[in-house]
Each structure stands twice: as structure tokens, then as C-alpha cells.
Amino acid sequence: VYTSREVENPQSAARSKLTTLPSYPACWEQHKQAWEAAWDTSDILIEGDTQAQLAVRYSVFQLLIAAPWWDRQVSIPAKTLSGFGYRGHIFWDTEIFMLPLFIFTQPELARHLLSYRYHTLEGAR
């Protein structure tokens, strides 16, 4: 995915990128490896309560899929990627409720979330 922040013509850049991508099986293998690595560092285990385990894993999954791995100037929207409410707005409490997971499991990503606040500080004033 390209936007006008990165390139002059996002549609053309996307078409060009498609010609250089590996095969679907190769992409699938990379995808699986990336998720294995993410779960290796971010999983939270709850013994003796399967329902709680599933709920926590679902929550961690939502945070991982919405986290801005690629960009220090965006943050996690209020309903992550699973809801349309709030139209992608970022709220003040991201750092209170979401940042702790990333501080302990994905420190570089935690830095990205804090960088978002730094980059938007002038607009907040």
C-alpha cells in the first residue's frame, strides 16, 4: 500500500511493486514466519482458563495488526482494524491502555507510538 506521503503516484507505485513480489507460496511462508516471531515475543499465557486465554490472545492480535510497524507518524486507531467507529481517530488514552504491551514485548514499536505524539505535538498546541 502506498500513499501520497511516500510517492507522487501511489497507484503507479503499487502496480510497479506487484511485478517484483515473490510467488504466493513464498509470501505465505514469510507471513507465517512473521506471525510466529510476533507471537514468540508478544504472547501472554494464562493457564487453567481457556476462555481468558482466547480473549487475551484476541486482544493482543488486534493490537498487533493495528500497530504502526512501518511508520513513526501514525498510531493505533480507537477500534483498531476491526471496527468502523470513530473513523480512525486516535485518542488520548492510547499510551495508557495500549503502550504497556509494546513496551514489554515490542520496544521499537512502543517508540513508534510515542513518536506519533511527538510528531503531532505542534498541531495539538
Q: Which residues fall in each region the model found?
A:
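Active-site-proximal structural scaffolding
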Residues: 52, 74, 90-94, 110
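Carboxylate/His-rich catalytic cores and anion/metal-binding grooves
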Residues: 49-57, 98-125
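Acidic/polar, glycine-enriched structural segments that form the non-catalytic walls/loops
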Residues: 1-86
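Segments forming glycine/polar-rich beta-alpha architectures that bind adenosine-containing cofactors
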Residues: 83-89, 94-95, 100
